[in-house]
Amino acid sequence: MASLGVNIDHIANVRQARRTVEPDPVPMALMAELGGADGITIHLREDRRHIQDRDLTLLGQTVRTRLNLEMAATTEMVEIALREQPDMVTLVPERREEVTTEGGLDVRSQCKSLSSVIDTLQSNDIPVSLFVDPDRNQLEACQQSGARWVELHTGRYAEASWREQPITLARLIEATEQARSMGLRVNAGHGLTYQNVEPIAAIAGMEELNIGHTIVARALCVGLQEAVREMKCLVQNPRRDPLFGSTSS
C-alpha cells in the first residue's frame, strides 16, 4: 500500500504572488497531516519562487510525519540540507525558465558529481532519492550513484491521451520492477490527479506518491484536510487494474 506525500509548494505560490505573509505553508502542512498526509514535500528552488528558507526551517521543527526536501544538487543546497536535516532529500533537475520540473535527472551524465552529493548527504543520515524518468539506463545509473531511492517521473503518464496512457503506465510498472530488482526503493510523482492516481497507486512495490497541485486546487472547494483525505483514500484503496486502468469488480 502506497503512502501519500503532500507537496505544499503551491500554497507558497499563492503567498509569493503578492509577496506577503499569507497563506503560510507551515500551518497548512499541519492541516495536511490532520487530513492523513504521510509526509510533507517542499521544493526549495534556487530562485526561491515559492518555498522560502524560513519555511524549511519552521517545517523541520513542526512536521510530525516526515519532511522531504526537493532540491538541486548544488553546493548551496547541500549546505542547507546539512543544516536543516530533513527526513529525506530528493534531487531534482532545475531550470529557472521552467514553470515546474519538466523531466527527470540525467543521472547517467552526472553520475560522478551526483555520487559525491549523495555520499555527503547519506553520510550525515539524510537518505537520498533521485527524480528520474522511467528508463532502465537511468535506473542503472541511480544504482551506481549510491542512492537508496528513486522517484519515478509520472509526467508523461499524466499528460498522455487515453490511447497512450496504457503504454506509459506499462513503462512505470516495468521501471518499478527494474528498480526494485536493483535494490532501489520506489516513489513516484508529477502531474498526478484524483482522476489518474489509482493505477499508479496500485503498482506493486510503489512506496509513496508525492502529489501537490491537484490537492491544493481541490482544497479551494472542500478545504485542505478534506482534499488530502479524499486523495489518501484513492492512494490507499486503488480500484483500478494497474495494467489497463479499468475499474475492477
From Swiss-Prot:
It is found in: Cytoplasm. 3-amino-2-oxopropyl phosphate binds at residues 7, 18, 191, 212-213. It catalyses: 3-amino-2-oxopropyl phosphate + 1-deoxy-D-xylulose 5-phosphate = pyridoxine 5'-phosphate + phosphate + 2 H2O + H(+). Gene3D superfamilies: Aldolase class I. GO terms for molecular function: pyridoxine 5'-phosphate synthase activity. One of its GO terms (cellular component) is cytosol. Keywords: Cytoplasm, Pyridoxine biosynthesis, Transferase. The record marks 151 as: Transition state stabilizer. It comes from the Bacteria. Transmembrane segments: none annotated. Homooctamer; tetramer of dimers. Belongs to the PNP synthase family. This is Pyridoxine 5'-phosphate synthase. It comes from Synechococcus sp. (strain CC9311).
